[in-house]
A protein has these predicted regions:
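Sequence termini and other peripheral, non-core segments
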Residues: 8-9, 21-24
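Hydrophobic h-region of N-terminal signal peptides that target proteins for export
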Residues: 11-19
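Primary mode marks residue(s) on the alpha4-beta5-alpha5 output face of response regulator receiver
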Residues: 23-189
Length: 189
């Protein structure tokens, strides 16, 4: 999951459309480049085709508003790559992740009531694996580049304590371990 410069695109990507508008007012994200067909293709690359084909596809306009490019039916919302970040980062997320992102935007602990799934099958880059609010890497640090992955949130982040927090551990790892924003990153390969 990417929390970085241009993070608002990713954050808003997983919000249910009603919450996206509220979050979009908080901080405008850069608009994705390309025509509508290219943006839809980019957004759909975030998730398995059976999810992406029925997902809402949306983007953030240059003025920070959510624009639906295609209505969906399965409760997932996909957003295209943010061209202003160091790695491809389209995202496709369910409504539980929307709750997580709403809480993150408000800097409040998320009140997750069910398991949530988000896909980033093109990968992502993150400012930090430990600080949920870092917008750029700390001095002397690099972006944490994560290959294709699925993200999982659970109602109680302590349920993830058995997993390592090292993104180079070779398997699932916890991002933001020890915080209310902890979630499991599951590499696709």
């Amino acid at each position: 999951m990417s929390l970085k410069m241009g993070v608002v695109l990713l954050v808003i990507a997983a919000l249910p459309l009603g919450a996206q508008e509220q979050a979009g007012k908080a901080k405008a994200a850069p608009a994705a480049k390309g025509n509508a067909a290219a943006k839809i293709a980019s957004a759909m690359s975030a998730a398995p085709s059976r999810i992406a084909s029925a997902a809402t596809i949306a983007e953030i306009s240059a003025d920070g508003k959510i624009v639906t490019l295609r209505a969906g039916t399965n409760g997932f919302t996909c957003f295209p790559d943010d061209p202003h970040t160091p790695a491809p980062d389209p995202i496709c997320a369910d409504k539980a992740w929307g709750q997580w992102f709403e809480a993150w935007m408000a800097k409040k602990p998320p009140m997750i009531k069910q398991v949530g799934i988000a896909y980033m099958l093109m990968g992502s880059s993150d400012a930090s694996n430990t600080d949920p609010f870092a917008m750029k890497p700390a001095a002397g640090q690099s972006w944490v580049v994560t290959p294709a992955h699925t993200m999982v949130i659970v109602p109680d982040p302590k349920q993830l304590d058995a997993y390592p927090s090292d993104p180079k551990s070779g398997g699932p790892f916890v991002m933001f371990k020890g915080t209310p924003y902890a979630h499991l990153m599951v590499p696709a390969h």
